[in-house]
Amino acid sequence: MRGARGAWDFLCVLLLLLRVQTGSSQPSVSPGEPSPPSIHPGKSDLIVRVGDEIRLLCTDPGFVKWTFEILDETNENKQNEWITEKAEATNTGKYTCTNKHGLSNSIYVFVRDPAKLFLVDRSLYGKEDNDTLVRCPLTDPEVTNYSLKGCQGKPLPKDLRFIPDPKAGIMIKSVKRAYHRLCLHCSVDQEGKSVLSEKFILKVRPAFKAVPVVSVSKASYLLREGEEFTVTCTIKDVSSSVYSTWKRENSQTKLQEKYNSWHHGDFNYERQATLTISSARVNDSGVFMCYANNTFGSANVTTTLEVVDKGFINIFPMINTTVFVNDGENVDLIVEYEAFPKPEHQQWIYMNRTFTDKWEDYPKSENESNIRYVSELHLTRLKGTEGGTYTFLVSNSDVNAAIAFNVYVNTKPEILTYDRLVNGMLQCVAAGFPEPTIDWYFCPGTEQRCSASVLPVDVQTLNSSGPPFGKLVVQSSIDSSAFKHNGTVECKAYNDVGKTSAYFNFAFKGNNKEQIHPHTLFTPLLIGFVIVAGMMCIIVMILTYKYLQKPMYEVQWKVVEEINGNNYVYIDPTQLPYDHKWEFPRNRLSFGKTLGAGAFGKVVEATAYGLIKSDAAMTVAVKMLKPSAHLTEREALMSELKVLSYLGNHMNIVNLLGACTIGGPTLVITEYCCYGDLLNFLRRKRDSFICSKQEDHAEAALYKNLLHSKESSCSDSTNEYMDMKPGVSYVVPTKADKRRSVRIGSYIERDVTPAIMEDDELALDLEDLLSFSYQVAKGMAFLASKNCIHRDLAARNILLTHGRITKICDFGLARDIKNDSNYVVKGNARLPVKWMAPESIFNCVYTFESDVWSYGIFLWELFSLGSSPYPGMPVDSKFYKMIKEGFRMLSPEHAPAEMYDIMKTCWDADPLKRPTFKQIVQLIEKQISESTNHIYSNLANCSPNRQKPVVDHSVRINSVGSTASSSQPLLVHDDV
């Protein structure tokens, strides 16, 4: 081995001598000048296969050093010869030989490795608008199509330009900010196949193209000595290389500051520099600057610190502190004041009396550093006796301050005395402010006004000052001897505000003057005016009383906001929000026939175009006011609209579809129910009713006392039965009266659309009644879950539509309750007494439980096929007494025993023992057929707005008022 190595050394020396002699491998140099070393083999590039030997020889007369560079790696060898016995792909790179003179020569070696075509440095950073190198040099220079490709086949940005270099990599030209986080591969074609390198993620360092954005937490600070001064400067830029610092104006002192920073996305950097002086002193006052700069430029912002030894209050009147105002006019006393620390107490005082209202105090600016405030005292219709000193007092934790306004009320003169004759002198005393002037006038006979002055008759005037800020009193006297004839004397007092006169009549009898009397010309006219005015007031009061006694329209549905103790707190419907998404153009409504009308409004059938679809027509019901409606009714209709929008949609309530509140009277658009109200539907179907149970009920007795005997049967005969007269209008029909008709379809065959058959043509059976009971209970459970009390649940307020779907509604203004015998006058309201719970009748209590009572009455209506409850019994004292004593109606003819049991529980005297609507739903579910339940479930699931799960009363109440429980006593509500 040593022999071979020696032979190789000898050969190298020989070659070196030959090269020196011939000088063919190096450029000619001048004698004495050093020359660069030479490398063997004498090529610029050398290609070897992986596993082969790399042998490089550097020849130079003196000392040489080898350097190998690839990517960021550098290796050195101080031998003349560089030998790598088994070449690897990582040995690809530039080999440089340097002599002692610093002259060098290089050769680039490619180690061809088909399994590793790229030498990859995956760190890839680029500065915006500069070139950046993707370092993926090749190990085989003979591959083709050396380029860049996007990851996962994504195309490269259209404006991306690059230059490939097999020895260095691929240079991306003029990097853009949009290239940030761009995923790349280096790519070549080898033997017809595309080969990709490992992926690169390009991270772009943005270039500064604007100065930093700098802001401070406050522009100025005012502190007392010893308080902490803390100010935060926020610097925003595209990268964290922005520089920032706090500086004090005219000072080189290093300030203590803390930094917090974070990135908001890729090119949004934010830094907060907080400057703190733990205990500020007066000499710390000054201007502090937050300075920031980047390569583009600099920006700064300042904040001012003022430190005072203690707090202060400075008051500045906005008007003159001496104020003159005429009697009956208004005046505003306004001050501005600076207060530091913040004011704690402010008040206006007059005559040792503190104003509790009529004034307001507010900061002049919403700026956090504001110390200036405004206080205004509003004096309205000042009287002559209300002049005086009005004082504003303000204080904070350090000082007190006050300012006073002297208010003088200018008053028209008032003549106090004008009929006194003292020692032959006629006196006239007047008071007013400013001081009045008195003139005398005379005219013969009895006149309304005198114009001839008595001057130059001797007139004596005596001024006397009144109380401070009060009226000034002036007394004037005239010698009555100046008057030689019968006549009228006028005393006229005037000042800048106005004038007042008094008249005197006198006459001569012989040589003596008769006692002077006041002028009485206008007394009859004045008395007549007072009488007429009094009569007008009485008429207005009577009309107002009658108007207030007139039953007013109000929304029956009440939404409970919370329960406090024994009181329901209702949401004021006028305060509910109204979303204008419900607005519908008026010109897309075409009105038809009137469906119902009352004293205040009506419901009209209409066609709405484009309500659901842009090109579709839909039949709707529109509730509107009559032209005679008052403001109260207009507000009530708007409240009803807000309540409906608050409740949302449910299959068993009449849902809101839209509204028109702009550009005309309010219109409420709701679903149209083609079969009208359930009460009349039941009465129409009596003769076609198919009963699926025994019809042998006795009809002799309709009432019994359920208070003491809960389980009495129809056959019981006790003193608790009442002898009742037949109903005036409708009574329970007997079996003999009925004419049965054959049903042409079953419930399960119906569809919600009228395409197959009209539901009104079908007969009515017990399954229908159970379905109606179930649906109304579901609807009431939904209202209860929304904390809504109905207050007028009855068959007349249930509508029926396709598929015999029931919908709960409130006719409200569209019902003529004045002519409806179901509504009885009680106080100044008409109430559906026979449907009301005892607590509602006697205590004006409306609760969720009182709705349950009404539901029991509704069930009686339903299973009696539309008969009036308590038939033949008028609402009088006897009725009220029997309700109190526990008398309840017997089961209607067509009610199953289970349904009558539900009615009895709904009529429990103790409201808290009545079932909730959720429990009622569960009870009825056990009785309806599977087909009916299945159909209802399908309809509910197909509804565009499925209702939320219904909650129980106790859960609902606890969710509304935290202090309530399911066992709470009756809750009193005064709003009937």
From Swiss-Prot:
Superkingdom to which the source organism belongs: Eukaryota
UniProt site (Important for interaction with phosphotyrosine-binding proteins): 936
Signal peptide extent: 1-25
Effect of residue 559 to D: In GIST; somatic mutation
Broad enzyme group: transferase
PROSITE patterns: IG_LIKE (PS50835), PROTEIN_KINASE_ATP (PS00107), PROTEIN_KINASE_DOM (PS50011), PROTEIN_KINASE_TYR (PS00109), RECEPTOR_TYR_KIN_III (PS00240)
Gene3D superfamilies xrefs: Immunoglobulins, Phosphorylase Kinase, domain 1, Transferase(Phosphotransferase) domain 1
Annotated effect of mutating residue 804 to W: In a colorectal adenocarcinoma sample; somatic mutation
Membrane spanning stretches: 525-545
Region (Important for interaction with phosphotyrosine-binding proteins): 568-570
Record comment: activity regulation: Present in an inactive conformation in the absence of bound ligand. KITLG/SCF binding leads to dimerization and activation by autophosphorylation on tyrosine residues. Activity is down-regulated by PRKCA-mediated phosphorylation on serine residues. Inhibited by imatinib/STI-571 (Gleevec) and sunitinib; these compounds maintain the kinase in an inactive conformation.
Protein kinase domain: residues covered: 589-937
Result when mutating residue 939 to A: Reduction in SH2B2/APS binding. Abolishes SH2B2/APS binding
UniProt effect for mutating residue 796 to G: In PBT; with sensorineural deafness
Effect of residue 746 to A: Abolishes down-regulation of kinase activity by PKC/PRKCA-mediated phosphorylation
Residues that coordinate or bind ATP: 596-603, 623, 671-677, 796
Phenotype when changing residue 829 to P: In a germ cell tumor of the testis; somatic mutation
Modified-residue entries (Phosphoserine), positions: 741, 746, 821, 891, 959
Function comment: Tyrosine-protein kinase that acts as a cell-surface receptor for the cytokine KITLG/SCF and plays an essential role in the regulation of cell survival and proliferation, hematopoiesis, stem cell maintenance, gametogenesis, mast cell development, migration and function, and in melanogenesis. In response to KITLG/SCF binding, KIT can activate several signaling pathways. Phosphorylates PIK3R1, PLCG1, SH2B2/APS and CBL. Activates the AKT1 signaling pathway by phosphorylation of PIK3R1, the regulatory subunit of phosphatidylinositol 3-kinase.
Family: Belongs to the protein kinase superfamily. Tyr protein kinase family. CSF-1/PDGF receptor subfamily.
Record's protein name: Mast/stem cell growth factor receptor Kit
Organism, scientific name: Homo sapiens (Human)
